[in-house]
Regions:
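Phosphodiester-processing cores and adjacent nucleic acid-binding clamps
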Residues: 1-265
């Protein structure tokens, strides 16, 4: 999120709200202790932890941030079932991504309940919540529309802008004004060029505020290869495989405040 701040010598401030630590298993390459060093190096004063579907690292993250004098924001990038968490039909029941951040203790308890239910009741390839659970446990949480795998970007990519708009309004009405944000990302992907203008249009039409993030899976640009190796281990491939799963650019790192302003301000 980009905000003006008197405390920044350049009048700039930025907080990363979309971060994957090593607890996004075989995907995130941000070691928590090193992440705090990187945040301080960037002159940033707060950081969120939003691992994929889990809260394994929250306690370690919280303690490390406090020790470093950085404000910790507990969160999770949850998987939302395309139908319900009980529907588990091959090639039909997938998931979309959604960022949830804790505002307070109530939010933390509700996020823990959501993640637990995702494993106990909704697990199908991934631990999944559904909209019924979100309706039950949304209090105390801030919600961001997530990356290209989010429900709203996916609707845009499928050419259904009205569905994207309806989904955004549903989340806005559920979480309440000021607690739901359209998430803007730009990693230099072809899909970003399609989705970004439509997300901005949607936000302006609905009055839903926007939050700029970077889907950070590693600390620095030069760490992209390390994260690519993790993906190979996850998928049983090698770096030599032409069709291996990989991120298409090396922009998925913890960017400096100036880099984020250059992208979005």
């Amino acid at each position: 999120m980009i905000e003006p701040s008197e405390g920044n010598k350049q009048g700039r401030d930025f907080v990363h709200l979309h971060i994957h630590t090593e607890y996004s298993l075989l995907d995130g390459a941000c070691r928590i202790d090193q992440l705090m060093d990187r945040v301080k190096e960037c002159g940033q004063t707060a950081i969120a932890c939003t691992d994929h579907g889990v809260m394994y690292g929250c306690v370690q993250f919280y303690k490390a941030a406090k020790k470093a004098g950085i404000k910790p924001i507990i969160g999770c990038e949850v998987y939302v079932a395309t139908r319900t968490r009980f529907d588990k039909v091959n090639k039909i029941d997938g998931n979309n991504h959604l960022i949830l951040l804790c505002k307070n203790e109530t939010g933390y308890k509700n996020l823990a309940k959501l993640v637990s239910a995702a494993f106990i009741e909704g697990f199908y390839s991934k631990p999944r919540v559904d909209k019924q659970l979100l309706e039950q446990y949304h209090e105390g949480l801030i919600c961001l529309s997530a990356c290209l795998a989010g429900e709203i970007p996916q609707a845009i990519l499928s050419g259904d802008y009205e569905r994207a708009k309806a989904s955004a309004l549903w989340y806005r009405d559920l979480f309440g004004e000021g607690n739901y944000y359209i998430e803007l990302q730009d990693h230099g992907l072809e899909e970003d060029n399609i989705v970004l203008p439509q997300l901005i249009k949607l936000a302006r039409e609905t009055g839903i505020p926007m939050a700029a993030t970077n889907d950070s899976h590693y600390l620095r640009k030069e760490d992209a290869k390390m994260q690519a190796i993790l993906l190979c281990i996850q998928t049983g491939r090698t770096m030599q495989d032409a069709d291996r799963m990989e991120f298409q650019t090396d922009e998925f790192y913890v960017k400096t405040t100036d880099e984020m302003y250059d992208l979005f301000a």
